[in-house]
Amino acid sequence: MSIQEKLSTALAFHQQGQLLEAGELYREILAEDPDQVDALNLMGVVMQAAGDLEVALDLLGRATELAPDYFAPFANLGNVLQASGRLLDAVEAFETALKLNGDSPETANNLSSVQNELGNPIAGLEASERALSLIPQFPEAIINKGNALLALARPVEAVNAYREALTLAPDNARAHFNLGNAYLDLEAYAEAVEPYLKSVTLDDRNAKAWFNYANCLVELDRIDDAVGCFQRALSIEPDYVDALCNLASALQSLGQTGDAIDLLRKALISQPDSPDLHWNLSLTLLQHGDYSQGWREYDWRWKMPTFEDYRRDFDRPKWDGGPLDGRRILIQAEQGFGDCIEFCRYIPMVAAMGGEVVLECRPELNRLLGTLDGVAKRIDLGAPLPEYDVHTPLMSLPRIFNTDLQTVPSDIPYLDVPKDAILDHAVLSATGLKVGLVWAGSPTRRDNHKRSCGLQALTDLMSIERVDYFSFQVGPEASELQNDPLFAGVADIAAGFSDFADTAAAVADMDLIISVDTSVLHLAGALGKPVWGMLSTPTGFLWMNDRLDSPWYPTLRLFRQPQPGDWDSVVAEVCSALEERLAKSPQG
């Protein structure tokens, strides 16, 4: 056979998918004529299909050198360069190909794909629209258009693009996967479930699809299902660090902290300097009760993006826990009100090291913290700093004092009611068991909707007699009280609080506080008042696993959700406990 006859036969094999047979003929041709451009080009395609990208690059590179005006080798070279991760070179190859043949929708679409991969969504969108101008019903180009739109923070348009692609190619796993991603971007988690499920059904070897599907299920509190999906992702990619991390978080939510710790330690072998992994490990260790290691890992919080607002530059050294010998130490309260109330218990211990303590705190806590032993001076957060010698963040003190479960400082009360605090007359005139209520946490917390039970969940409490209820609820949720006649008997005293000193005065006069996980719960515990905490599942790491008490607050009793979102069971248990208390001691 002549070279041309061999080429025709090889091309027929190639088009029928018989790549081995085609490859043999291409080799024969190149043995006879090493510069046969068509054979170089097509053999390059065969070698890419075989996974030998280096040989493919060599063949296609020679073809483009021999025929610089030939479209096909440049288009195919772009594909191999993209597969090799040489994305900028791939862009150059595709753009050269399009200069030679501007009517190639496939090449324009491939250029869109690589531009999106490079993080150039504007160029990616332009290239996909060029492809679609040539073939309007081109599913892959529509998908790439959606990817560009999603990267440009235009998720609604991306959803429409993916849906359009799916009308043309309903079994395209990538379109279903990306539609799920767009819904995830919109925080439309319920809508994301179906496309993710369809995606992993069509392509069950896509680890990223299983991973994103699992993340979606976590947001919907379907933690058990999410665990299975994370495990599927890891069965495909055992060293998928993000999947290891998120599976650990899911297991932590389920209270399986031992397994979660093992996963995080495995992930840290691959990424030993990952702030995310160390931060999650710290929370998991603390929830597990391993305080000695957990508080050491907790210092990684300063490398987390979520702590950026708390990071500060100081011109004095950090305190290492050694004797202070009369030096002035600046302690910065950090994170939420409840965190400050809980961990300010360490300040008398700092003062006992021989130092003069200056406490920087949020203004709402300033008066209350004036009752804390060991504080020489208080300043509001944001005010000019006085002179100081060393400093430390408040929540580094458990590590500095080597706190473990047996050495948690639990002498209460460690806070008191300031003498100038104002008490509402409604509290003074109450005759029944005085019970304070809080049904929602801080609206600035991402998980607040899970931690908060809502006023309606407390309906059954209203039928219990000989109880005077008082609302300690602040923020937007406080208005729920005025909008529901069922709760007309609840006195709203929180509106009169100017700061936590006034809150403390009211808490001190209660017989019992019933609260979700929020600052009032911590305040009641710090004041030594009986307090019942209603906890969501998952819950805060400091409440540990399954415990109904806490080493931090001896007067605290915990009521836990048996399943995520199940506030009915929690409130039913609280009602039974309250009736039992009334039966034993009607006066509280």
Predicted regions span which residues?
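Alpha-helical solenoid repeat scaffolds of the TPR/TPR-like class and their adjacent stem/linker regions
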Residues: 1-512, 517-588
